[in-house]
Design a protein with these regions (language model features):
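Acidic, glycine-rich calcium-binding repeat modules characteristic of RTX/beta-roll
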Residues: 1-27, 117-302
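Extended interaction-bearing regions that mediate binding to partners or small molecules
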Residues: 1-85, 100-105
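Short, hydrophobic/aromatic-rich segments at coil-to-beta transitions
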Residues: 28-35, 61-65, 252-254, 268-272, ...
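General beta-strand recognition
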Residues: 44, 274, 294-296, 313, ...
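Low-complexity acidic/polar repeat-biased segments
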Residues: 52-99, 301-339
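Extended, small-residue-rich solenoid/repeat segments and analogous flexible loops
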Residues: 66-123, 130, 139, 148, ...
Length: 339
């Protein structure tokens, strides 16, 4: 398992270029360490059984640590390696940065960002990535990853596996992948997308924009005035506190505005709209009796139903559900029920 720790200067994985090391003459070379200095940076390599050519990194042995720095300070420190020096030297000689990064970070790695903006990637394996402070770009890559944005307005993405993604503080953009993702924007006004798969997608605090996308998703606004779009699939949507907008999309969805004055649409499918006493005033914009839409109220709720203008209005203590454009006479006996 590689442990990558960024220095105070910040790191962009996409700009890391190992190729020039092939030209650097070994300095203070021993069987366990060497320094390679070129173009204003110094790379220190530690391990065992090293042998060397006239230039470049070790040609034989095992590498267990790589430290890269510049005059201004540490760039990054990689520990926990068990890497063939000959393989590493081959990547460097070929200028093959893609294979080098994939090889170094091919396991269950821990990647720790700096206090400024970083661009970090996990590659394959079940990785833990922490962005720290700064506006970071964090990509978990393949595997089942845990990714934490830290403070700052971060972009977090993870294309494969089943992932645990947290925005932490800041206005973050989080995008899940093809598997089951547990995503929470936490603090800040976040944009959160589940991607493919059956996901748990939560906005957290503040006013969030939340997309379930494909799959059977749990989409939850939590605090703030949130906008929720469940996408395709038989989804469960909850607005939480605040005045929320909930859109079910295709599929038989469960839609609950929870507390606050909420606006709800179920989309295609037989949708179940939930409310309760003291929940606020909820408006259902596309209630469709023919599709099988229904309203479920908590057990024990006392309510009345009336036609007010062109709408059917369900009134409870401290709340209403307004079926916009629906005639009360068109409702079925089970269109409104307790459960």
């Amino acid at each position: 398992m590689a442990v990558f720790t960024a220095g105070a200067l910040g790191v962009d994985f996409d700009l890391v270029d190992l190729g020039p090391l092939i030209l650097a003459p070994p300095a203070s070379a021993t069987p366990t360490s060497v320094g390679l200095s070129l173009l204003g940076s110094t790379t220190q390599i530690f391990g065992s059984g090293f042998t060397f050519a006239t230039a470049g990194p070790p040609t034989a042995g095992t590498i267990n640590r790589i430290i890269v720095g510049v005059d201004a300070g540490l760039v990054y420190d990689i520990t926990g390696l068990s890497l063939s020096a000959a393989t590493f030297q081959g990547w460097v000689a070929a200028g093959d940065n893609v294979s080098a990064k994939a090889g170094i970070f091919g396991g269950a790695d821990q990647i720790i960002g700096s206090g400024v903006a970083d661009r970090l990637r996990g590659f394959s394996g079940d990785d833990t990535i922490t962005g720290g402070a700064g506006a970071d770009f964090l990509d978990g890559g393949d595997g089942d990853d845990d990714v934490y944005g830290g403070t700052g307005n971060d972009i977090i993405t993870d294309s494969g596996g089943s992932n645990y993604l947290r925005g932490d503080e800041g206005d973050d953009n989080l995008v899940g992948g093809a598997g089951f993702d547990d995503i929470n924007g936490n603090m800040g006004s976040d944009t959160v997308s589940g991607g493919l798969g059956d996901d748990w997608v939560v906005g957290g605090r503040d006013n969030d924009l939340i997309f379930g996308e494909d799959g059977v998703d749990l989409v939850y606004g939590n605090l703030g005035d949130d906008t929720l779009d469940a996408g395709n699939g038989a989804d469960t949507m909850r607005g939480g506190q605040g005045n929320d907008s909930l859109m079910g999309g295709a599929g038989n969805d469960y839609v609950s505005g929870d507390r606050g004055d909420d606006t709800m649409t179920g989309g295609a499918g037989a949708d179940l709209f939930h409310s309760f006493a003291d929940a606020g005033i909820d408006r259902i914009l596309d209630f469709n009796v023919a599709q099988g839409d229904r309203v479920i109220l908590d057990v024990g709720t006392t309510f009345s139903v009336a036609q007010i203008g062109g709408d059917t209005v369900i009134t409870m203590s401290g709340g209403q559900v307004i079926l916009v454009g629906i005639s009360m006479s068109s409702l079925r006996t089970d269109s409104i029920f307790l459960g």
